[in-house]
UniProtKB/Swiss-Prot annotation:
This is Beta-2 adrenergic receptor. The gene is ADRB2. The chain crosses the membrane at residues 35-58, 72-95, 107-129, 151-174, 197-220, 275-298, 306-329. Glycans are attached at residues 6, 15. Residues 391-418 have a biased composition (Polar residues).
Length: 418
């Protein structure tokens, strides 16, 4: 977000930065600018590199092109725009102690900032709803939320985010009326974000607090359902091991199906944990800023500007965290290694999206229609329908199977955040 407009102090600047005629002070100021410039450049590099890697991996490997990962792509796009169009200009504003890009770009830059944060949390909210349906209505899920429907949802998220961010700022509904704010609006080198109280509170509620409440509520429900499913798995495992060995030998496929069902559900729960970490990290990074944002307009001089800007940058840094969190997923981890040439590439055999061996074993070897979850008639099915319900021999362009197999990740689900 833009800088608050109460004072002209800059983030962590040395005390004597306004006395450049003193040699010692000038040297300290130069050292501060260089040091902060390096740190901010590394932040920008991490945001851009990490999210380009995520988007490229999902675009290149069809194995990663699941409905949930479509939403992850949207989240990565928001983070990438943050790294390209927001953070560098924010860094320039701090390091140069003035705005050098004019009034139009000041408001446009601020609008993009609000857009990225709003799109991110609304996407996380959609992911929470997506996981809720995936784990509570597994057999309806694939028809309920197809890839085409996911694209429409993503488009709607960005349209709503764009309207709530650009419209109030470009129409000047956000502007305060006191003299200091009016002077700043008229000055080409001032980009302090003076806002009226109504806009600050309303935008914080619409762009952050409301989606946050929905996200927390839905995800808490998801974890409750997941916990019940884990308990069912434990009980079912106990019954399975208590069966007569001769009965298991008579129907070995049943035992294999049961183990696959349990493994599938456990992987689904690991995916939930990964998404929970993403949502939790976003909340921890941005919640302090939005609390201060409300307090600042209610009590103007209560929060030092340095604290406001520092918390704003903590939120910016969140855009670099998500690619690291995705590394919890073996599929993402292997895809990243392939793209970075950190492991032997098998992409040549899959260059056209197909294996050159139509009989080659996939990660879902042995999976057939009529998924194993259907065999557990005495327990409620709460996990997503396993990939055995599709003709998986015809899946195209996956992350190379020999790469997956070499890591011992056979039997992974069709949700790549595992």
């Amino acid at each position: 977000m833009g800088q608050p407009g109460n004072r002209s102090v800059f983030l962590l600047a040395p005390n004597g930065s306004h006395a450049p005629d003193q040699d010692g002070t000038q040297e300290r100021n130069d050292a501060w600018v260089v040091g902060m410039g390096i740190v901010m450049s590394l932040i920008v590099l991490a945001i851009v590199f990490g999210n380009v890697l995520v988007i490229t991996a999902i675009a290149r490997f069809e194995r990663l092109q699941t409905v949930t990962n479509y939403f992850i792509t949207s989240l990565a796009c928001a983070d990438l725009v943050m790294g390209l169009a927001v953070v560098p200009f924010g860094a320039s504003h701090i390091l140069m102690k003035m705005w050098t890009f004019g009034n139009f770009w000041c408001e446009f830059w601020t609008s993009i900032d609000v857009l990225c944060v709003t799109a991110s949390i609304e996407t996380l909210c959609v992911i929470a709803v997506d996981r809720y349906f995936a784990i509570t209505s597994p057999f309806k899920y694939q028809s309920l939320l197809t890839k085409n429907k996911a694209r429409v949802v993503i488009l709607m998220v960005w349209i709503v985010s764009g309207l709530t961010s650009f419209l109030p700022i470009q129409m000047h509904w956000y502007r305060a009326t006191h003299q200091e704010a009016i002077n700043c609006y008229a000055k080409e080198t001032c980009c302090d974000f003076f806002t009226n109280q109504a806009y600050a509170i309303a935008s914080s509620i619409v762009s952050f607090y409301l989606p946050l409440v929905v996200m927390v509520f839905v995800y808490s429900r998801v974890f409750q359902v997941a916990q019940r499913q884990l308990q069912k798995i434990d009980k079912s495992e106990g019954r399975f091991h208590a069966q007569n060995l001769s009965q298991v030998e008579q129907d070995g496929r049943s035992g294999h199906g049961h183990r696959r069902a349990s493994k599938f559900c456990l992987k689904e729960h690991k995916a939930l944990k990964t998404l929970g970490i993403i949502m939790g990290t976003f909340t921890l990074c941005w919640l302090p800023f939005f609390i201060v944002n409300i307090v600042h307009v209610i009590q103007d001089n209560l929060i030092p500007k340095e604290v406001y800007i520092l918390l704003n940058w903590v939120g910016y840094v969140n855009s670099a965290f998500n690619p690291l969190i995705y590394c919890r997923s073996p599929d993402f981890r292997i895809a990243f290694q392939e793209l970075l040439c950190l492991r032997r590439s098998s992409l040549k055999a899959y260059g056209n999206g197909y294996s050159n061996n139509s009989n080659s074993r996939t990660d879902y070897a042995g999976e057939h229609s009529g998924g194993p979850l259907g065999q557990e008639k005495d327990s409620e099915v709460l996990c997503e329908d396993p990939p055995g319900t599709e003709n998986l021999a015809n899946r195209q362009g996956t992350v190379p199977n020999d790469s997956i197999d070499s890591q011992g990740q056979n039997g992974s689900t069709n949700d790549s955040l595992l």
